């Protein structure tokens, strides 16, 4: 399905930068700020995007101990809007990264494309909530690593939007073959599989225009 690149993030960001510089044609870097760092985090985003070639932002409320819609995230989102890059946010662990909190952040920043990574993770209530929130807010996108229900991938494709659900692995935490098999057994046809596996992410990140 034409998978030829991967999105990568790491803390410290220098680890990701080393990988991007070593494999520039295969790795797309996501800068990984801690919103608690305030202006320092914003400055780092601009540096990594404008000077080091990174093309998105990773946010993890669970790891960095803030609620997804906390005002701490507003400067990060404003930077994303200014730079025209998407934000990828960990989704599915209370109390930090619940779908409705992420939706409130998306509502405040309608011009920023915000990807709910893990699509609610392993909790059925959170998975259904990601779908509901994504239907409500067109700037919300879904990534399905760690989400155990293949049927929800097809539901997202058909009900949220054909271009707003994408494959991911969350490597090294989940086996890539398991994540791929979830998509393969979701009931999507070949064109739809190509969208989920590659085309949608390529469009979101802008490397479909090469």
Task: Describe the function of each predicted region.
Residues 39-42, 66-68, 124-127, 152-153, ...:
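Short, charged, surface-exposed secondary-structure boundary motifs
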Residues 1-4, 162-164, 177-210:
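Mid-to-C-terminal alpha-helical segments outside catalytic/metal-binding sites
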Residues 11, 32-36, 60-64, 90-94, ...:
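Active-site beta-loop-alpha junctions enriched in small/polar residues
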Residues 24, 110-112, 197:
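Active-site gating loops and adjacent loop-to-helix segments of metal-dependent hydrolytic enzymes
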């Amino acid at each position: 399905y034409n998978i030829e690149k991967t999105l990568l993030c790491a803390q410290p960001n220098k680890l990701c930068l080393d990988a991007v510089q070593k494999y520039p044609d295969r790795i797309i870097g996501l800068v990984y700020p801690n919103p608690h760092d305030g202006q320092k985090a914003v400055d780092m985003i601009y540096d990594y995007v404008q000077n080091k070639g990174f093309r998105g932002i990773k946010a993890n409320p669970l790891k960095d101990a803030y609620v997804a819609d906390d005002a701490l995230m507003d400067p990060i989102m404003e930077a994303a809007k200014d730079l025209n890059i998407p934000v990828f946010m960990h989704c599915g662990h209370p109390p930090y990264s619940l779908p409705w909190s992420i939706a409130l952040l998306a509502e405040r920043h309608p011009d920023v494309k915000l990807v709910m990574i893990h699509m609610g993770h392993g909790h059925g209530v959170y998975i259904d909530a990601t779908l509901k929130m994504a239907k409500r807010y067109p700037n919300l996108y879904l990534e399905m690593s760690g989400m155990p229900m293949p049927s929800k991938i097809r539901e997202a494709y058909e009900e949220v939007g054909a271009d707003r659900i994408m494959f991911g692995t969350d490597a090294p935490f989940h086996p890539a073959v398991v994540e791929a098999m979830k998509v393969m057994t979701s009931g999507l046809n070949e064109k739809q599989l190509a969208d989920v596996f590659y085309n949608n992410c390529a469009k979101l990140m802008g490397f479909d225009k090469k």
